[in-house]
C-alpha cells in the first residue's frame, strides 16, 4: 500500500521513542496538574515535527542509504516514493506540527522544537553526518530536545529541570548511537560515514561508551537530588544506569562477541531511557524546587 510507504519514511520507531520522552517531560513539569488538551497537542505537534525531520533526512540520505544493507530498501531509495513527493510530505508534516506547537504551547517550547529540527535536518543530516566524527555529538542535541519541549510546554519556562533533561538525554544518545555504529560497522564503512568506530577504531569507541554511560548515570541522579523527582525515580535511575554501565564494561572481556555485545548495549539503552521517561512522569515532586530556577 502506498500509504504504508509514506508511514515508513517517517520512521515510526523514532517517533514512538520521542513520544514517550516528550510525554515524560510534560508530566514531570505538570507536577500532577495535567492540562490534557495541552499535553495532547504538544505530543501530537512534536511527533509531526519529528516525522517531518525523519522524512527530510530520508531525502537527504538517499545516496548513503543506497549503499547500506539496512537502508537500501527504503522507499526513497527504491523510488517507490519520489524525492519530490517525500519533500512535499515532509514539509506538510512540519507545517502541521509547528502550527500545533505555535497555537497551543509557548515560545520557549516552540524555540526548542525549531532548534532541534534545524540541528537535525540542517546541520547533522546535510553536513556533520557525512563530514565529521563529531556528527553524533551534534545530532545528540536534536535527540535531546523532545523531553525539553514537553517540559517547557507544561511549565512555561526553561529552568534547572529542563537543563538536566537536555543534558541527560544528550548524554544518553552517545552510547546508544555508538553501539549502533559498532554492530552496523560494515554499513557505515561502505557508505564512508565517519562515525567513531570507523574513524577512530573500536577500542576508542568502547571507552567513549563507558565514559558517556558513567556521566549519564551521574546526571540522571540530579533530578531526584535537585528535588524534581522522588526516591522511586532515583532507584530506577541507579539500577538501570549501573546495569547499563556493567554491560558496557563487559565489552572489555576477552573473546567477547563484538556484534552481540553492541546489540545488548543498544537494546538496554532503549530500556533505560524508557524506564526513566516513565519514572519521571509518575514520580514527580508536587512542589517545585524554587531555588533552582535559572530562567523564568
Curated annotation (Swiss-Prot):
Gene3D superfamilies for the chain: UbiA prenyltransferase (1.10.357.140)
Matches recorded under PROSITE patterns: UBIA (PS00943)
Transferase is among the record's keywords: yes
Membrane topology: Multi-pass membrane protein
Major site of localization recorded for this protein: membrane
Family matches, as Pfam families: UbiA
Localization of this protein: Cell inner membrane
Keywords tagged on the record: Cell inner membrane, Cell membrane, Heme biosynthesis, Membrane, Transferase, Transmembrane, Transmembrane helix
Catalytic activity: heme b + (2E,6E)-farnesyl diphosphate + H2O = Fe(II)-heme o + diphosphate
Entry's Gene Ontology BP terms: heme O biosynthetic process
Pathway recorded for this protein: Porphyrin-containing compound metabolism; heme O biosynthesis; heme O from protoheme: step 1/1
A GO CC term attached to the entry: plasma membrane
Enzyme class, UniProt record, top EC level: transferase
A molecular function GO annotation: protoheme IX farnesyltransferase activity
EC annotation from Swiss-Prot or TrEMBL: 2.5.1.141
Residue ranges crossing the lipid bilayer per the database entry: 9-29, 36-56, 82-102, 108-128, 133-153, 163-183, 207-227, 229-249, 264-284
Note: Carbon 2 of the heme B porphyrin ring is defined according to the Fischer nomenclature.
Recorded family membership: Belongs to the UbiA prenyltransferase family. Protoheme IX farnesyltransferase subfamily.
Function (record text): Converts heme B (protoheme IX) to heme O by substitution of the vinyl group on carbon 2 of heme B porphyrin ring with a hydroxyethyl farnesyl side group.
Protein name, as recorded: Protoheme IX farnesyltransferase 1
Source organism (scientific name): Pseudoalteromonas atlantica (strain T6c / ATCC BAA-1087)
